[in-house]
UniProtKB/Swiss-Prot annotation:
<comment type="pathway">
    <text>Protein modification; protein glycosylation.</text>
</comment>
<keyword id="KW-0326">Glycosidase</keyword>
<comment type="function">
    <text>Alpha-mannosidase involved in the maturation of Asn-linked oligosaccharides. Progressively trims alpha-1,2-linked mannose residues from Man(9)GlcNAc(2) to produce Man(5)GlcNAc(2).</text>
</comment>
<feature type="disulfide bond">
    <location>
        <begin position="337"/>
        <end position="366"/>
    </location>
</feature>
<protein>
    <recommendedName>
        <fullName>Mannosyl-oligosaccharide alpha-1,2-mannosidase</fullName>
        <ecNumber>3.2.1.113</ecNumber>
    </recommendedName>
</protein>
<keyword id="KW-0479">Metal-binding</keyword>
<dbReference type="GO" id="GO:0006486">
    <property type="term" value="P:protein glycosylation"/>
</dbReference>
<dbReference type="GO" id="GO:0036503">
    <property type="term" value="P:ERAD pathway"/>
</dbReference>
<comment type="subunit">
    <text>Monomer.</text>
</comment>
<dbReference type="GO" id="GO:0004571">
    <property type="term" value="F:mannosyl-oligosaccharide 1,2-alpha-mannosidase activity"/>
</dbReference>
<dbReference type="GO" id="GO:0005576">
    <property type="term" value="C:extracellular region"/>
</dbReference>
<dbReference type="InterPro" id="IPR012341">
    <property type="entry name" value="6hp_glycosidase-like_sf"/>
</dbReference>
<dbReference type="GO" id="GO:0005509">
    <property type="term" value="F:calcium ion binding"/>
</dbReference>
<comment type="similarity">
    <text>Belongs to the glycosyl hydrolase 47 family.</text>
</comment>
<feature type="active site" description="Proton donor">
    <location>
        <position position="380"/>
    </location>
</feature>
<keyword id="KW-0964">Secreted</keyword>
<dbReference type="InterPro" id="IPR050749">
    <property type="entry name" value="Glycosyl_Hydrolase_47"/>
</dbReference>
Amino acid sequence: MKGSPVLAVCAAALTLIPSVVALPMIDKDLPSSISQSSDKTSQERAEAVKAAFRFAWEGYLEHAFPNDELHPVSNTPGNSRNGWGASAVDALSTAIIMDMPDVVEKILDHISNIDYSQTDTMCSLFETTIRYLGGMISAYDLLKGPGSHLVSDPAKVDVLLAQSLKLADVLKFAFDTKTGIPANELNITDKSTDGSTTNGLATTGTLVLEWTRLSDITGDPEYGRLAQKGESYLLNPQPSSSEPFPGLVGRTIDIETGLFRDDYVSWGGGSDSFYEYLIKMYVYDKGRFGKYKDRWVTAAESTIEHLKSSPSTRKDLTFVATYSGGRLGLNSGHLTCFDGGNFLLGGQILNRDDFTKFGLELVEGCYATYAATATKIGPEGFGWDATKVPEAQAEFYKEAGFYITTSYYNLRPEVIESIYYAYRMTKDPKYQEWAWDAFVAINATTRTSTGFTAIGDVNTPDGGRKYDNQESFLFAEVMKYSYLIHSPEADWQVAGPGGTNAYVFNTEAHPVKVFSRGC
């Protein structure tokens, strides 16, 4: 059963059974009009994802709540995100979208009791912003809007905003630097930092959506102004050598001078969500963030011209290379695979067919990294440099078009995320099939008795070593995107061609309400 593309379980049995989360049986030999386009099939799949979410939530609730995450092999709690209950806060927007009032109430009660001024560990401004601040602001927007029926006491919703303000006030000393570029690693108890003189492109450039939204809701401009000041150095990069191609910049910034220290260009970890937020800020408010859009367009066009790459053995696949010191790096990874969805969003909002076409090519390439492995799950890292193929992977590279450089999978969402965008832009049911196959593979290989765990090797049939960790983004992202692609139209769904987005997803998949003059 492990590694199989479909678990043959009766479609009616959408409850949990001891060994697996029950999934509807899909006959791959049926005509596509039945197996791919049936509303009944989509409903069954959405319910199966919802059942998997509840299974993981109950395991976390029993063995780890109110800690940050569950270690789902040893069934012990972990606190990698300051002990404030990251899995609960990250799960909230998904529980709202899945219409789970009991889960929503439990998390709201928990959030009301968090003391964000207290922690025993260093605090990441970036991670705290995207998971905690983004999770609470998103839930506030949703529960004040399409999810309002889920909460009987409006005061519980107002607590989300109050706690968001308290958290931002705890964190804002990070911006108290000579340039306004924030420090990332913070000791919030004594308002000190780890002493680093640099910050990263993504960790600096992935704050502006959440902090701006907080200002817009509250009417206090301070929060957005802080994030936008740090961002301003990224929009006007210096020195010129740090921008080897128009719009594409290095990933390390000097906090004291605002100057970039390198020219390493990537859409992967360390850089990724800076580019992601450039176009998303324009989706959020076209009136204020036109320059962000212009920089994204410039970066996107340069990416197509300079970084687009295909393996020598699979010219049908498209990946995005890295660049530094005059040389392309023919390597990528799971984190980079958000890029297809980001290009598709840009194509939709700007009516640019070239971005849409390239986005679909990237989705195809990243899905191929899933389809080729023994588990049908993609690896953390991969390459396609024909001069660097490991001897043991020569045949694999010939057939797959890539070789694995880092074999683990820690429940990352980016491939399913981009497949979701592809479906929203095309309504081609093949993307629902791809997302379903990925979800089934994750369920088959990473599931434990209480949740889902990171695995050591996606190219061994059982996934290899179980790493005994369940990241909070399983709840926020993997489950949400897997559910949304099979779900009916709703305000929070990404708009297709010609449509208008009512929400924009932060990098942790928390939907933030698009700005309007009435907020």
